[in-house]
Amino acid sequence: LALLALLALFVSATNAFIIPQCSLAPSAIIPQFLPPVTSMGFEHLAVQAYRLQQALAASVLQQPINQLQQQSLAHLTIQTIATQQQQQFLPSVSQLDVVNPVAYLQQQLLASNPLALANVAAYQQQQQLQQFLPALSQLAMVNPAAYLQQQQLLSSSPLAVGNAPTYLQQQLLQQIVPALTQLAVANPAAYLQQLLPFNQLTVSNSAAYLQQRQQLLNPLEVPNPLVAGFLQQQQLLPYSQFSLMNPALSWQQPIVGGAIF
């Protein structure tokens, strides 16, 4: 009997199978992902594991979709705010386009210019230099040698390196001085009118400038127009921006009426 009992135990031990412990672990998680009917009924462990895998995969896939939806909503909100701001500025921009198309185009190019964004001072200096380009191009067509000489002086002059617009304005004034001298000899009144933009007295006090002009052009006080032109040039010299920028060069310019003395 003892041998038969041992034999029966041996046979039952060889036919028995071990259930892995990992298959019992998801048993507490399965019901929250499965419908109540399937969780209550009998279902194979493999089917339950498959359903659990599908439910977990669906929950993982839903998270990026929600994030993308939130990002798209935020993007739409930003676009809406930008559109509203643009609509607020459209009337003023359209008025600027009608009044001054050049300023409108300059304003449009300002935002897209990397130099304007990086260095505002350099951009403004570049814009000032562009104002003198037509005069320089005319000088290059009329007198190429003078244009090349001016370009060489532009690179070697400390004033040109420090303040290029002032240097170019000074060079242009030097070219205008002979023509103004001839104009002063021929017509002193027109000479004073040509000096009007460069006279600081005119900008600060127009009445004093007109009084000075009437005194200079009075035939009882100055009977000779050549002497009148000379006095005009000497009295306007302290107020001229040209003499303030370079007094030595201003004194070197031809003196009107010098032949009479």
Curated annotation (Swiss-Prot):
Keywords: Seed storage protein, Signal, Storage protein. Residues 1-16 form the signal peptide. Disulfide bonds: none annotated. GO terms for molecular function: nutrient reservoir activity. InterPro entries: Seed_Storage_Prolamin, Zein. It holds the Pfam family Zein. It comes from the Eukaryota. Belongs to the zein family. The alpha zeins of 19 kDa and 22 kDa account for 70% of the total zein fraction. They are encoded by a large multigene family. Structurally, 22K and 19K zeins are composed of nine adjacent, topologically antiparallel helices clustered within a distorted cylinder. Zeins are major seed storage proteins. This is 22 kDa alpha-zein 8b. It comes from Zea mays (Maize). The gene is AZS22-8b.
